[in-house]
Amino acid sequence: MLFRSTESLVAWDEQVANFGGEIIAARLQALSEFEPIFQEIYRDISSEKPAFITYKSSIEEPTQNPLENSTKILERMKVTRASEIERGLTLTGPHRDDLLLNLGDHLVKGYASHGESWSIALSLKLATYQLLEKDGLKPILILDDVFSELDEERRVHLIKLAKTAQQTFITVAVENDLPKELSGDRFFVKSGQVSKISKSAEVK
């Protein structure tokens, strides 16, 4: 839709600001609960560098107060009005925000090693699992061929964390990648056929 008058945008700006302020506040609230769990898990998996999450916003100093965020969105929209009209898109609001993963003083993207990236990804998954569990849900933990990507130290830490889950599904391409410390039923899948195997059985 092409607006020929900036006056037509006022009502839309208010809607974006009101709902946007609430969304940003809710995200920050969720992040305040999620990040400590994520950091603790990452420390258990890899203690080399501290990991943390930064909320990158299109407004300055977003808070958990929806009204404050809405006011800042409206103020920012006034500044970017000409650019928005020229480009045909809204440059301020929660749709422009992002979460940045940090490892020490660097962004994970473009800096973290393969092992560190896997540790970060696992920490995010496990933190999500624990947060859902904390809210009274009973999630299932699914780990898809992760042990082959980790060094021995990280494998040991992940095994300890996996044991705390009520129900876990783990897939591996090679049976030896599945740690012997983990108990439970094991199945071999080939060409769409599923067969149960013993813990000590060798898959050929």
Residue ranges: model-predicted function:
Residues 6-140, 149, 153, 157-160, ...:
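Conserved NTPase motor "head" modules and their coupling/switch loops across ABC/AAA+ ATPases, GTPases
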Residues 167-173:
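Structural recognition of the conserved hydrophobic beta-strand(s) that form the central parallel beta-sheet
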Residues 185-187:
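Conserved short hydrophobic beta-strand within the ABC ATPase nucleotide-binding domain
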